[in-house]
Design a protein with these regions (language model features):
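Internal, well-ordered alpha/beta segment that forms a basic, Gly-enriched binding/recognition surface
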Residues: 28-127
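Intrinsically disordered, low-complexity coil segments
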Residues: 6, 15-20, 90-102, 264-268
Length: 302
């Protein structure tokens, strides 16, 4: 079902000036909503482990929750978060498990252990988001060395994440390369504020710097949300691609935060971070093709 839009592109059933409510939802109930509206802000993944739901933080309420969350953990999804059938999303129930690297498959238990271990690193209060991503990347390099026939993949994941593995080189795209990649994949469907910022790190340090530290927990929560139940696991060529997906999420938040500071001349506040996260998820979950992202970062799996 399609719904009409006004001259500004907004849904004609959205009461912008009267409580910001949906007329269809109010008058006919959730079952009458178009599928995209019924599912938003949920993003579903279904595989051999079960049905998983994460949130699009383009939804302002979901984005605000990242700022105030004191703990980070995976919890069971219950109604109204979990929907009744039909559920739409990425259905990988009949697919092979995610790739460890281009020529080796994970098993589902091993992949689940890797995903949970990555989220556990992001939940650590003693690590910054950047440090956590580096830890995940380094541990993933050790996991990629696993081959069948010895210890289980689950055990290999536990061993790789148990100690600081930062000395293991982990290939990655730079901040500028990551933003440029997403900009190209957006194919002109977003405003020019996604264009890469020249001398990004210098300007970040001058305009944002330590003022962003108070929001580092929100950044870790956001990156964890993008790693949990991600689609890149089934669309990409290995675990490195998922790490790049997490790095892309962080890079876009940094980009949009700096862009707002360059425009305003101020210091970042909660509203700036919330809007930066919203714009990051708009791009990652609603604008670009995640399959195209997986193809674009595939060379890093070599």
């Amino acid at each position: 079902m399609d719904v009409a839009r006004d001259n500004n592109g907004s849904c004609v059933f959205f009461e912008q000036e009267d409580g910001r409510l949906c007329v269809i939802h109010r008058e006919a109930g959730v079952d009458a909503l178009p599928s995209a509206c019924r599912h938003f802000p949920r993003k579903f993944l279904r595989d051999g482990r079960g049905t998983f739901v994460s949130l699009s933080h383009f939804c302002p309420t979901a984005a605000i929750l990242l700022i105030g969350a004191e703990t980070l953990e995976v919890v069971p999804a219950v109604p109204p978060l979990m929907l009744e059938e039909p559920i739409e999303g990425l259905d990988a129930r009949d697919a092979l498990p995610p790739l460890l690297c281009p020529d080796v498959l994970c098993d589902l238990d091993g992949y689940d252990a890797w995903e949970r271990a990555a989220i556990a690193v992001l939940a650590r209060p003693d690590l910054t988001c950047q440090r956590a991503l580096d830890w995940i990347g380094a541990a993933t390099e050790r996991v990629r060395a696993w081959r069948p026939g010895g210890q289980s993949l689950t055990s290999a994941v536990a061993a790789a994440f148990a100690n600081d593995a930062a000395q293991v080189p982990a290939p990655q795209l730079t901040q500028e390369e990551m933003v440029d990649l997403v900009w190209r994949l957006s194919d002109g469907r977003v405003p020019s504020d996604i264009e890469p910022i020249d001398r990004f790190e210098d300007r970040w340090n001058a305009r944002v710097g330590p003022a962003f530290d108070r929001y580092d927990g929100a950044m870790k929560n956001y990156v964890a949300a993008r790693i949990f139940a991600n689609w890149i696991a089934y669309q990409g060529r290995g675990l490195r691609s998922i790490v790049q997906w997490g790095r892309a999420a962080a890079a876009l938040v940094r980009h949009h935060t700096l862009r707002r500071m360059l425009d305003s001349g101020g210091s970042p506040g909660p509203d700036d971070v919330i809007e930066a996260i919203r714009m990051a998820d708009l791009l990652l979950l609603h604008v670009i093709d995640t399959q195209a992202f997986a193809r674009a970062v595939a060379p890093i799996e070599a």
